[in-house]
């Protein structure tokens, strides 16, 4: 029997599936067993790496999965979560029909969840939506979604909200994780997302991790970095964090710094570059310009908070002023080696070695960061400072060099950022506050002038406050779990959700904490139960086809959005003055205007592949996903956001945009790699008209909350390898649940001894906002310094975000989950 590598891996997957099911297959029968399984490509459902998988289906179920050997991202590998992908779909408590709180046969906020039809669910929703808009205007209704919905779903929801409801009150949970990176990209380069790609890994000579535990959070990329490090003795790895985690095992330089002092370290490096004449002056003079940022900008707390009252420049937090190199030099001069050591606690020699990595003109350096950088009340500044370092040294937009923000969700880039599901964004980096951008969107969407408004909605944290304060009445949460994942849930989120005047809808495959706090649960198709597309951290867009049907009456998010649009007319949602000027739109449903506009419904069912499942398209009578994508792609073609044709992505293992003349772009802004850089330009940061990037001078400013006598410990929250976010999927995989069944609190042994605590003790962790009961770990994988504890938020039985502070970066509005003050004592 001769098997190709691909066939061998498929057979391996068949064996794995049988083993997981408790079956034993003789080796000679493996190929026969595999032949009964239908295989197709898909994208992993978890992090933003974008690993490709082969999915095996049989008898209408997903029975196996395997890393795709033809995929450049992961090259046939999966992490522990990826290996168990099939099992995320078959938890015993899958939601299979809409469930509405009812009493005596009608909706009641305090009623019991009762099965209803989709029509009853949508009629109830529509009634609440219309009442909220009548009372409070378009921003009386809100959508909170995620970077886990597909590109098609993100586009459909953004269009329904911004055009149909004329409301910009739509935000993703990427606000909690990627907003600071996106804002800093836009401010620095005039365009979002990294200029490099994963190919940098095999060419870099130094890797610097800023607040990123890639070993557990991006393990496939970490395996590539490990291979690079161990195969070349000249390659170095530096890891910076407030505690020691598994990524430190590979580190040549370990930097454990005091919370929030990464700003000091970054400015020290810039000072070192200047003092040691390590500036690439030719690059800086040709390709950059200098600005200084506004300071004393507050912490994104409620306006009445003393910290906000005290801050001088809350209203101008994002302002940048013209500056020059000398002003930057003067600002960073105080960040000496002595000061950086004193404030951060990092040994001087280690700080200096890190600075030398960046200063060495012959050393190719890639900087990676995730939530440790972004979930930060000065996260935008932190992002700017790392861009400063790469711009000052010219180590950017070339193979093996560059700043690289890693995403945590599979389509935080593709859906949240590129599609534009933030309150201020439209597709392809357009924004609702720009009249020309609104006009372009209205033209593409075939809308009358003035339909899209410039009034911003409530960002993620502000949505919770608005519900609590009665400034918003309806929230539709889709494909996320904010009642567990959001900050300060006891004081800010829960009160608004259970406010009797508010109506909360949650679309999810499982009965999450959010579902149980809601008024209506909508059962959702997940992963390969629908046709989908994700955009990963390296600008790679990847497609998959529907491979099985969803259970019961569960429907995909895109079906829910498009079907729901039928319950509204333009007369109900648009002002009379617009309709009077454009009478041809009167009386039409939002479905007719948005999705039957001659573009979204352009492609007939005959364009579906023979035998292809596509429940949404067969329901609506046209190839919905293709129509949505081609209309969406028209926003970006011709100005640096080019996407390939829809059909191309079904054939490829993903392509990195901009895709021009069928060719993807690996490194943006560099001549010879980027088709938008003209011959002779060398480098062109074409997001700005002058094609220059911004170097921003900003200082250190303290955190919003620090330990004191009563709350004497720092709290940092995050994840572990085995679980993903709030555990909605991974805790329903028996193997993953057994490997890490509940949340822990990691503490330094000395801190434990001071409190009379021992490893394994049940402890109470309390902040000014709430408390949880957990279990102490003083010996495990995470080794924290004295004065700090680390915990995770995957455990619905502990709800760690009762502790966290709802402080945000005042510019990006991203939440700081990494720093607040707590106390720990033995639980009764």
Swiss-Prot record:
Post-translational events: Predicted to be exported by the Tat system. The position of the signal peptide cleavage has not been experimentally proven.
Q: Organism's domain of life?
A: Bacteria
Subcellular location, in the record's words? Periplasm
Tell me if Transcription regulation is a UniProt keyword of this record.
no
Q: How is the cofactor bound?
A: Binds 1 [4Fe-4S] cluster. Binds 1 molybdenum-bis(molybdopterin guanine dinucleotide) (Mo-bis-MGD) cofactor per subunit.
Identify the stretch annotated as signal peptide in this record.
1-32
Binding sites annotated in the UniProt record for Mo-bis(molybdopterin guanine dinucleotide): 81, 148, 173, 177, 210-217, 241-245, 371, 375, 481, 507-508, 530, 557, 717-726, 801, 818
Which top EC class is named for this enzyme in its record? oxidoreductase
> Known EC number(s)?
1.9.6.1
So which cofactors does this thing need? [4Fe-4S] cluster; Mo-bis(molybdopterin guanine dinucleotide)
Q: Name one GO biological process term.
A: Mo-molybdopterin cofactor biosynthetic process
Keyword Signal carried by entry: yes
| Keywords per UniProt | 4Fe-4S, Electron transport, Iron, Iron-sulfur, Metal-binding, Molybdenum, Nitrate assimilation, Oxidoreductase, Periplasm, Signal, Transport
Q: Which residues bind [4Fe-4S] cluster?
A: 44, 47, 51, 79
Q: What molecular function terms (GO) are annotated for this protein?
A: 4 iron, 4 sulfur cluster binding; electron transfer activity; iron ion binding; molybdenum ion binding; molybdopterin cofactor binding; nitrate reductase (cytochrome) activity
**Subunit notes for this chain?**
Component of the periplasmic nitrate reductase NapAB complex composed of NapA and NapB.
- What does this protein do, in the record's words? Catalytic subunit of the periplasmic nitrate reductase complex NapAB. Receives electrons from NapB and catalyzes the reduction of nitrate to nitrite.
Q: Which NCBIfam families match?
A: NAPA, PRK13532.1, TAT_signal_seq
Protein name (record)? Periplasmic nitrate reductase
Instruction: Provide the species name.
Output: Aggregatibacter actinomycetemcomitans
């Amino acid at each position: 029997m001769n098997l190709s590598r691909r066939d061998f891996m498929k057979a391996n997957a068949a064996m794995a599936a049988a083993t997981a099911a408790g079956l034993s297959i003789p080796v000679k029968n493996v190929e026969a067993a595999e032949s009964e399984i239908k295989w197709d490509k898909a994208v992993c459902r978890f992090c933003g790496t974008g690993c490709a998988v082969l999915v095996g289906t049989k008898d209408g179920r997903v029975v196996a999965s395997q890393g795709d050997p033809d995929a450049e991202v992961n090259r046939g590998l999966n992490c522990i979560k990826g290996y168990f992908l099939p099992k995320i779909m078959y938890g015993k408590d899958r939601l299979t029909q809409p469930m509405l709180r009812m009493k005596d046969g009608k909706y009641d906020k305090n009623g019991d969840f009762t099965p209803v039809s989709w029509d009853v669910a949508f009629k109830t929703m529509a009634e609440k939506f219309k009442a909220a808009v009548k009372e409070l205007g378009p921003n009386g209704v809100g959508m909170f979604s995620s970077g886990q919905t597909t590109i098609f779903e993100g586009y459909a929801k953004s269009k329904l909200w911004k055009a149909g409801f004329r409301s910009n009150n739509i935000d993703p949970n990427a606000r909690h994780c990627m907003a600071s990176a996106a804002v800093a990209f836009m401010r620095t380069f005039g365009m979002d997302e990294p200029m490099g790609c994963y190919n940098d890994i095999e060419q870099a000579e130094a890797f610097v991790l800023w607040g990123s535990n890639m070993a557990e959070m991006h393990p496939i990329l970490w395996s590539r970095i490990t291979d690079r490090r161990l195969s070349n003795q000249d390659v170095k790895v530096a890891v910076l964090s407030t505690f020691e985690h598994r990524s430190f095992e590979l580190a040549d330089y370990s930097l454990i710094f005091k919370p929030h002092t990464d700003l000091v370290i970054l400015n020290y490096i810039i000072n070192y570059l200047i003092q040691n004449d390590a500036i690439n002056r030719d690059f800086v003079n040709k390709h950059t310009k200098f600005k200084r940022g506004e300071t004393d900008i507050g912490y994104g707390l409620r306006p009445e908070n003393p910290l906000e009252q005290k801050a001088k420049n809350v209203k101008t937090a994002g302002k940048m002023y013209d500056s020059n190199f000398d002003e930057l030099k003067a600002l960073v001069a105080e960040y000496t080696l002595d000061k950086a050591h004193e404030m951060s606690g990092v040994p001087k020699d280690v700080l200096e070695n890190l600075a030398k990595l960046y200063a060495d003109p012959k050393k190719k350096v890639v900087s990676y960061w995730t939530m440790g950088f972004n979930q930060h009340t000065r996260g935008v500044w932190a992002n700017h400072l790392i861009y400063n370092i790469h711009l000052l040294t010219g180590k950017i937009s070339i193979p093996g060099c560059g700043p690289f923000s890693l995403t945590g969700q599979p389509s935080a880039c593709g859906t949240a950022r590129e599609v534009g599901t933030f309150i201020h964004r439209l597709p392809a980096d357009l924004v609702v506050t720009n009249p020309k951008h609104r006009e372009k969107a209205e033209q593409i969407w075939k809308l009358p002038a003035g339909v899209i408004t410039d009034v911003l909605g409530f960002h993620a944290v502000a949505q919770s406050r608005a519900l609590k304060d009665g400034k918003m009445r309806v929230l539709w949460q889709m494909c996320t779990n904010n009642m567990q994942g959001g900050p300060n849930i006891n004081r800010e989120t829960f009160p608004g959700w259970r406010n009797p005047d508010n109506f909360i809808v949650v679309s999810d495959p499982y009965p999450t904490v959010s579902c149980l706090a809601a008024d209506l649960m909508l059962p959702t198709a997940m992963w390969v139960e629908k046709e989908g597309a994700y955009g990963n951290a390296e600008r790679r867009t990847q497609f998959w086809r529907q491979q099985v049907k969803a259970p019961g009456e569960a429907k995909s998010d895109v079906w829910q959005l498009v079907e729901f649009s039928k319950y509204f007319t333009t007369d109900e949602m648009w002002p009379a003055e617009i309709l009077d000027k454009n009478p041809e739109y009167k009386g039409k449903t939002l479905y007719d205007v948005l999705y039957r506009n001659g573009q979204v419904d352009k492609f007939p069912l005959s364009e579906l592949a023979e035998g292809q499942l596509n429940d949404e398209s067969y329901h609506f009578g046209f190839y919905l996903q293709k129509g949505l994508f081609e209309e969406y792609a028209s926003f970006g073609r011709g100005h640096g956001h080019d996407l390939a044709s829809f059909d191309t992505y079904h054939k490829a293992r993903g392509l990195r945009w901009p895709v021009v003349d069928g060719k993807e772009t690996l490194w943006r802004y560099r001549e010879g790699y980027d088709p938008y850089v003209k011959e002779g330009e060398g480098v062109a940061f074409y997001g700005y008209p002058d094609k220059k990037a911004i170097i921003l001078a900003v200082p250190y400013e303290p955190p919003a909350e620090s330990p004191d006598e009563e709350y004497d410990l720092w709290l940092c929250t995050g994840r572990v390898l085995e679980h993903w976010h709030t555990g909605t999927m991974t805790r329903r995989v028996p193997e993953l649940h057994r490997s890490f069944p509940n949340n822990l609190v990691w503490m330094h042994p000395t801190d434990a001894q001071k409190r009379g605590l021992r490893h394994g003790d049940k402890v109470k962790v309390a902040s000014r906002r709430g408390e949880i009961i957990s279990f102490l770990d003083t010996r495990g994988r995470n080794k924290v310094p004295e004065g700090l504890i680390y915990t995770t938020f995957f455990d619905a039985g502990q709800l760690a975000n009762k502790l966290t502070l709802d402080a945000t970066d005042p510019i990006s509005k991203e939440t700081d989950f990494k720093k607040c003050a707590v106390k720990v004592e033995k639980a009764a």
